[in-house]
């Protein structure tokens, strides 16, 4: 029987043959074995960033390689070398909330979804854009159902609504570990309702949602047009409010701007406090970057912080994503963390990057886990066709190839097929966050590859 370290050696050998040489040498080779127990393979990365990158981008490939070696399911955990105890001690304890299981489902294990460990008040940067929402969140966390009930937090994507909501939950459970805190998305509420109806479990559904001491409901705008869900939510809201339960709701817009929302729900959502979260100003964006850099133990020069904060203005998620990409770029290329070095990577349009069709194919293949041969084939499997379309889109925007020439690269496809692919990706980028993230990842890899070869 192989030891854990021997398993990792064989996994590395497998990945060396499946990944590009730069990817293997940058991420897999420096990673060391820590422990293998009860199906969990624990690895050690050099720093916080490497740990996060491995987890987000290579954990599935490692798990598949390990499963091929030992013939059993494997879960990969990546920790930080020489800093495990410190990093674990710096985080608050994981807080679990019981999951809903309808009648007849008792054989299923409780999956215990948890509040995000990072969404606590001391990690939230307060600025003029969020001062009222933050103060209101603190108020209901300290004294639920006393002043603002419900608390309705609204604002655009990535501005911190979910962070504030979950921070309230963490705070309450820290004060009262026995409190019944329920954090749920509107989609989950709807899905639970559908399951309860199908399995004749409405009483269990109501008991589950109405037993909470504090209920946090995210993305309430998705109640739009769901008449039966709105009906049930109305009665749930009333029962909770009358029993003195604190209700916190979050939406991308105020109640009166949610289309096809019942007037009685609009009235109830508006009876407490509506706290708006706006996009952060320059000073707040700089403070957010500085705080994240400190949390990740990364030293950033002030002019680089100001450059990133001035370039990414829409929301916090975009801002922090830019910082993550900048740190990755500097880490992989070995370039200093300066505006001059980082600016090309943060060009949202990828301008100034010269790439070849071969590079595009390699990076798309790496990110989408589809081979170049598959992309050049006539396969219509969704993973293959999507990777092919992304490749065509990136070749159009990153090389000087004509549409017919791009079609030739992809196995002799017609130029109209290339045009259609480009149009499809351009449409999906604004509506499919996962695809947008994958495309951005390919662009980042192309940036890194391009700079390496200069």
UniProtKB/Swiss-Prot annotation:
Q: Which family does it belong to?
A: Belongs to the DnaA family.
Annotated spans, Domain IV, binds dsDNA: 331-454
Q: Which amino acids does the record list as binding ATP?
A: 158, 160-162
Outline the segment boundaries, as ranges, of region: Domain II. 84-113
Q: What is its main location?
A: cytoplasm
**Subunit description:** Oligomerizes as a right-handed, spiral filament on DNA at oriC.
| Domain of life according to the entry | Bacteria
Q: What does this protein do?
A: Plays an essential role in the initiation and regulation of chromosomal replication. ATP-DnaA binds to the origin of replication (oriC) to initiate formation of the DNA replication initiation complex once per cell cycle. Binds the DnaA box (a 9 base pair repeat at the origin) and separates the double-stranded (ds)DNA. Forms a right-handed helical filament on oriC DNA; dsDNA binds to the exterior of the filament while single-stranded (ss)DNA is stabiized in the filament's interior.
Matching entries from Pfam families are given as: Bac_DnaA, Bac_DnaA_C, DnaA_N
Q: What is the lineage of its organism?
A: Bacteria, Bacillati, Cyanobacteriota, Cyanophyceae, Synechococcales
The record ties this protein, via PANTHER family, to:
CHROMOSOMAL REPLICATION INITIATOR PROTEIN DNAA (PTHR30050:SF2)
Which stretches does the entry tag as region Domain III, AAA+ region? 114-330
For the region Domain I, interacts with DnaA modulators, give the residue spans. Answer: 1-84
Set out the biological process GO terms recorded for this chain's protein: DNA replication initiation; regulation of DNA replication
Name of this protein:
Chromosomal replication initiator protein DnaA
State the UniProt keywords alphabetically: ATP-binding, Cytoplasm, DNA replication, DNA-binding, Lipid-binding, Nucleotide-binding
Q: Name one GO cellular component term.
A: plasma membrane
